[in-house]
A protein has these predicted regions:
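NTP/phosphate- and nucleic-acid-binding module
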Residues: 1-476
Length: 476
């Protein structure tokens, strides 16, 4: 019963452990043990993204976890950006390795080394590959599903004959993120083009997907990068075009942060009772609670088994809780774990050939004939998805306020909101004003320009020069 709006950090950390999503007591700081409840949810989140990627022509691959140091050194911006975060392997058994090997922080320098061997002709393009994996970064401050030394994601690495083809892919990546995060997982978010000083190391442009957390901070749970020819030139990836000229392809990468997506789901949809999991990723979608009294025990348990069989046959993930805990304890337990629907089955329901169906997000209950259970749950699952999205969108919209001055910007961030501001430019010349804003607002970072809004002109709230609309927020 902690109010996440009042004390988000306490609420979040309490629910992570109480609902058995994860355990931080593994004896390496910053590394997390994922318990079955999160591991199963991750499996479903992965499938949603992988299905969309494969519909878009991507194919899966599995690359080694280790990347040799010489690969990093081939792209100067990339190595400068990631070196402070890299874990290095320097020994094998009792022997010192002749060269250092990195635990992958991201895999551009692995993929492009192989692309130089695989790509020869324009007929090989586009090449669109992805892998689902863990990556490793030496983070100083960690928090489960928000920031970690090891985390789960998907990374795509795509090659195109032309710049236009690569840039078009970044738009497709955004559409994939919308389909999964918004349509399936009910997460409202803002798509941004990041400022030039905040782009991915080695990219020409970075596009990122931010939601707002209950404490008013921006949370990036995915990004797409237009890499131009930076990596293809560095790794000598080339192809013969239709005229026989040798060229370097243009490339992109897309990183749906699977780990962070779950962090967003926990934070945005959860309430004072605990998790509220979207139907499509819930490890258990329907839990049946037999309410056993006296002579009705056998009939109640038989009816619970019958209902489970009916629903499981239709593809639903169903569990019967026949432990010796009280019904009240079971209700609270499964509500805390975010199971979308609860069926209460007692002697009265057996006599009426019905079930009492409770919905997790609204906590509404209704008596439903057993013959109608499957279609009722399907309809309510769609309603739940829409309701969660509407709530998420309303909260996001209410958290965006316009700042005409630096004082406005600080006040808005202190109100746990995003500030809509004007800044002179998002090119490198604007970094001085962005740094001034960060200092003045105690941590507010320029997120960039929204991709789904038309450009708006105005005077920079720092220097007064003609500028453009952007967003400011504190962040994770």
């Amino acid at each position: 019963n902690i109010d996440k709006k009042v004390n988000f950090s306490e609420w979040y950390n309490t629910i992570i452990y109480a609902s058995e999503l994860a355990d931080i007591r593994y004896n390496i700081k910053g590394f997390l043990v994922h318990r079955p409840w999160s591991a199963i949810a991750f499996r479903h989140i992965y499938r949603l993204f992988e299905n969309e990627l494969e519909l878009d022509g991507h194919q899966p691959v599995i690359f080694p976890t280790l990347i040799p140091e010489e690969n990093f050194l081939k792209e100067k911006e990339h190595v400068a950006g990631f070196s402070p975060e890299v874990f290095w392997v320097t020994e094998k058994g009792n022997e010192k390795l002749e060269r250092k090997l990195a635990l992958r922080p991201t895999s551009e320098t692995a993929f492009y080394q192989m692309y130089s061997l695989w790509v020869d002709s324009f007929k090989d393009l586009p090449m669109k590959l992805y892998q689902s994996c863990s990556v490793f970064r030496a983070e100083k401050e960690t928090n489960p599903f928000l920031r970690g030394c090891e985390f789960l994601w998907i990374e795509t690495h795509d090659l195109f004959e032309t710049a236009d083809g690569a840039i078009a892919q970044t738009t497709t990546d955004l559409e994939i993120m919308k389909k999964v995060a918004t349509n399936h997982l009910s997460i409202a978010f803002l798509p941004f083009e990041r400022p030039q000083w905040d782009k991915f190391a080695g990219a020409e442009k970075t596009f990122a997907y931010d939601c707002i957390m209950p404490d008013g901070k921006a949370f990036q749970f995915g990004s797409t990068h237009y890499l131009g020819q930076h990596f293809t030139k560095a790794f000598d990836v080339g192809f013969m075009d239709s005229q026989g000229a040798r060229k370097n392809p243009y490339s992109t990468c897309f990183g749906p942060g699977i780990w962070r997506v779950l962090g967003a789901i926990i934070s945005i949809h959860g309430d004072q009772k605990g998790l509220v999991l979207p139907f499509v990723i819930a490890p258990i979608q329907v839990v049946i609670i037999p309410i056993v009294k006296g002579d009705a025990k056998e009939a109640v348990l038989n009816k619970a088994d019958e209902i489970k069989s009916i629903l499981a046959t239709s593809g639903l993930r169903v569990h019967i809780d026949n432990t010796d805990k009280t019904p009240g304890f079971k209700y609270n337990w499964w509500e805390m774990r975010g199971v979308p629907f609860r069926i209460e089955m007692g002697g009265r329901e057996v006599a009426e050939n019905s079930a009492t169906l409770a919905r997790r997000d609204t906590r509404e209950k209704a008596k439903v004939p057993i013959s109608d259970l499957e279609k009722t749950i399907t309809a309510l699952a769609n309603a739940m998805q829409n309701s969660l999205l509407e709530k998420s969108q309303n909260e996001l919209n209410a958290s965006i306020k316009t700042a005409l001055t630096m004082d406005d910007a600080k006040r808005i961030l202190d109100e746990l909101c995003f500030a809509k501001i004007f800044i002179c430019t998002l090119e490198m010349d604007g970094k001085r004003c962005a740094d001034a804003l960060k200092d003045f607002t105690k941590g507010g970072k320029v997120r960039g320009r929204r991709l789904d809004e038309k450009p708006v002109s105005g005077k920079c709230i720092v220097c007064g020069k003609d500028g453009m609309q952007a967003y400011l927020a504190r962040q994770y």
